[in-house]
């Protein structure tokens, strides 16, 4: 009964969510697009000519935002967008996509080959592991995903490049922040308005490699 009530509450909240309605109006595949838009505007990131890597890209709303930001005359992408996700993603015009598990060495190597030594301006990561509800185990999974994004960014970003990554407050969060501060000159936390109030998610914006 409680589970059924929770499901009904979630459906009601989802249907009445202004960001869900706005995403539908603007043609975004998910409300998460507005989280990225707010961060990009606040940080003045992502412009034409940039090379952008989108980790955890499905269903594609962040790739859609990147395509809009990089669109030049005639709507052609001025720059490059490479997206990766474990799940399939419907094509986004101008976006190169790899389907695979970012935690696997073989997939990381495939992504590195696609980047092909080209310096990356911005890495955006909306990746989130499957959570079990067991605090210690979940914290370890979250920390692992954030560390993988960090290692990839440090290997491929330009010296003045940036990384936007989703994290969650809780056990292990301070260690994630500390590890980012060890590698970047500036690290800030952002909680976009489109993030639901009850959600523990927060986004780290790391800029300028040390």
Curated annotation (Swiss-Prot):
InterPro entries: RNA_methyltr_RlmE (IPR050082), RNA_MeTrfase_FtsJ_dom (IPR002877), rRNA-MeTfrase_E (IPR015507), SAM-dependent_MTases_sf (IPR029063). The active site is at 166 (proton acceptor). Its EC number is 2.1.1.166. It catalyses: uridine(2552) in 23S rRNA + S-adenosyl-L-methionine = 2'-O-methyluridine(2552) in 23S rRNA + S-adenosyl-L-homocysteine + H(+). It comes from the Bacteria. It is found in: Cytoplasm. Belongs to the class I-like SAM-binding methyltransferase superfamily. RNA methyltransferase RlmE family. Specifically methylates the uridine in position 2552 of 23S rRNA at the 2'-O position of the ribose in the fully assembled 50S ribosomal subunit. This is Ribosomal RNA large subunit methyltransferase E.
């Amino acid at each position: 009964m409680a589970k059924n009530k929770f499901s009904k509450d979630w459906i009601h909240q989802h249907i009445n969510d202004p960001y869900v309605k706005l995403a539908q109006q603007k043609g975004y595949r998910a409300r998460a697009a507005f989280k990225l838009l707010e961060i990009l505007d606040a940080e003045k990131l992502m412009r034409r000519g940039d090379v952008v890597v989108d980790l955890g890209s499905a269903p594609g709303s962040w790739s859609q935002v990147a395509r809009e930001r990089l669109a030049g005359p005639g709507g052609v992408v001025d720059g490059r967008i490479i997206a990766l996700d474990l799940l399939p993603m419907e094509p986004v015009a101008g976006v190169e996509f790899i389907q695979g598990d970012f935690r696997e060495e073989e997939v990381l190597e495939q992504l590195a080959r696609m980047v092909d030594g080209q310096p990356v301006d911005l890495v955006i990561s909306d990746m989130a592991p499957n959570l079990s509800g067991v605090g210690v185990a979940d914290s370890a999974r979250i920390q692992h995903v954030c560390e993988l994004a960090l290692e990839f960014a440090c290997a491929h970003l330009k010296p003045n490049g940036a990384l936007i990554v989703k994290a969650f407050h809780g056990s292990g969060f301070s260690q994630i922040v500390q590890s980012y501060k060890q590698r970047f000159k500036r690290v800030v936390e952002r909680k976009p308005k489109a993030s639901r109030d009850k959600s523990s998610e927060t986004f780290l914006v790391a800029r300028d490699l040390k």
